[in-house]
Amino acid sequence: MNCSLRCRFFLILVMAGFSFFVALFGMRLMHKMAEFAYFEREHVVALSKVYYELHKKEINISFIVGQVQRARRQTTAVNSLWKGDKALLRLLGKGLILELSEASEIKLGLLERYASSIYKDGLNPGHIEEMKRLVSWPYTNSNRFGIEIADISKRVKAYVYFLVVSINCLFFVVIFLLMKKTRSSIDEIVHVMNDMSRGDLTYRTIPSNDEVGKMQSSIIAMGAGVSALIESIKHIQGDLFNSAGEALNISQSTSNDICDQAGKIDEFVSALSQISFAITETSNAANKSSALSSEGRQLAVHGQKAIETAVSSINALSQRVNDSHVAIKCIEADIAKIGKIIEIIDQITDQTNLLALNAAIEAAHAGEAGKGFAVVADEVRSLAQRTNNSTYEIQAMIASLNKGIFFALGVMGDCVVESKNSVNAASEASRSIEKIVDSVSQVMLQIAQVATASEEQSAVVKDMLDNANIIREIAAGVELGSRRISEVNTHR
């Protein structure tokens, strides 16, 4: 039992694995025996049906073949055992099962092939006798096989139970002994630690070679080291008392210097407080300026948007005026065409008057016969005169309309020029506002930089104040320590 903890745990694991393997193998073998018993019942039933079928007057060959195949399942299951299982059966004195199974497999194979080769029309008494002879041996020995199966099942179950119980008992005994050995070593370590806690560093023991023994050796070495350390501390204590006097003088001098530095630190803290207040005021003013600049920038942006809207409206109006100018030009062209048509009508009227005059002259020459023609000529001349008067009126109206169109074109041209001037002025104003917005943005950026710098300076000053306060507290602590050292050395 004088082995390491690792060896003990490995031994426990090996025994547990072996116990599990034995139990698993036994359960498998018992399952095989139960399977063989089931196939044996199938075997007996199938052979009985074959035997009774052969004694009938009308024999069904396909039924016999099916039952023989059913009976062969038992022999096939036995013959498919592992070599280890077969060796175990022979070791237990049950090799007869394997021999009976092999012989029955041969007989049933011959019977199946023989029955499959017989056709119904060719069946004769000789075939029946041959099949009876082939089935008689498996049928006769099936009882022996069943007895052997039942016996081996009982024997395997008993052996498995015995092995499992024995191995588990041995397993628990080994665990108990290992725990007892390990616990005694741990109790010894606890005893050594208790003695060391009471100041006894002289305990000695003979450690073992396992992990617990190594722990004991380490604890003993630690006790020796602690003992040597205590002796060294005793020697150092004397040197400390000698150095204490020198430390007293140094501490008194340091205390005086610290008192002087404390006054200067107070003045420095006061100056830093004033600087911090001024930086805070600057930061607040920068923030207010940033807010005002932001409002001014927003107003400028709104004004720029309004100007852009006005420019868009003026451009739309200018486009409409241009469209009207084009439409009036088209009207002017149409009026010119009308004037040409009126000129043609004047020419036609003049020709008509001339023709009417010639007709009247010819009617006068004709006398009475030309009176009716003279009346028509007068009417034609009258119509030509009215047409001529109408053309004069139309020409007067066209002249008046041309004057109005000329005036409208002039006004529209002025409107276009004015709208372009307005657009240019608005664009110039928009560019100016855009420059203002850019300038305000730069101002806001500079103000933000000023505010950021002020905040950073404020943070730096705050850190300096904190550090100064810490230095002051340290100085006060050092002064207090110097006084205590002086008091300790005075009482010593």
From Swiss-Prot:
<dbReference type="GO" id="GO:0007165">
    <property type="term" value="P:signal transduction"/>
</dbReference>
<dbReference type="GO" id="GO:0016020">
    <property type="term" value="C:membrane"/>
</dbReference>
<dbReference type="InterPro" id="IPR004089">
    <property type="entry name" value="MCPsignal_dom"/>
</dbReference>
<comment type="similarity">
    <text>Belongs to the methyl-accepting chemotaxis (MCP) protein family.</text>
</comment>
<keyword id="KW-0472">Membrane</keyword>
<comment type="function">
    <text>Chemotactic-signal transducers respond to changes in the concentration of attractants and repellents in the environment, transduce a signal from the outside to the inside of the cell, and facilitate sensory adaptation through the variation of the level of methylation.</text>
</comment>
<keyword id="KW-0614">Plasmid</keyword>
<keyword id="KW-1133">Transmembrane helix</keyword>
<feature type="transmembrane region" description="Helical">
    <location>
        <begin position="159"/>
        <end position="179"/>
    </location>
</feature>
<dbReference type="InterPro" id="IPR004090">
    <property type="entry name" value="Chemotax_Me-accpt_rcpt"/>
</dbReference>
<dbReference type="Pfam" id="PF00015">
    <property type="entry name" value="MCPsignal"/>
</dbReference>
<comment type="pathway">
    <text>Hydrocarbon metabolism; alkane degradation.</text>
</comment>
<dbReference type="InterPro" id="IPR003660">
    <property type="entry name" value="HAMP_dom"/>
</dbReference>
<feature type="domain" description="HAMP">
    <location>
        <begin position="180"/>
        <end position="231"/>
    </location>
</feature>
<feature type="transmembrane region" description="Helical">
    <location>
        <begin position="9"/>
        <end position="29"/>
    </location>
</feature>
<keyword id="KW-0812">Transmembrane</keyword>
<dbReference type="GO" id="GO:0006935">
    <property type="term" value="P:chemotaxis"/>
</dbReference>
<dbReference type="GO" id="GO:0004888">
    <property type="term" value="F:transmembrane signaling receptor activity"/>
</dbReference>
<dbReference type="GO" id="GO:0043448">
    <property type="term" value="P:alkane catabolic process"/>
</dbReference>
<keyword id="KW-0807">Transducer</keyword>
<dbReference type="Pfam" id="PF00672">
    <property type="entry name" value="HAMP"/>
</dbReference>
<protein>
    <recommendedName>
        <fullName>Putative methyl-accepting chemotaxis AlkN</fullName>
    </recommendedName>
</protein>
<feature type="domain" description="Methyl-accepting transducer">
    <location>
        <begin position="236"/>
        <end position="472"/>
    </location>
</feature>
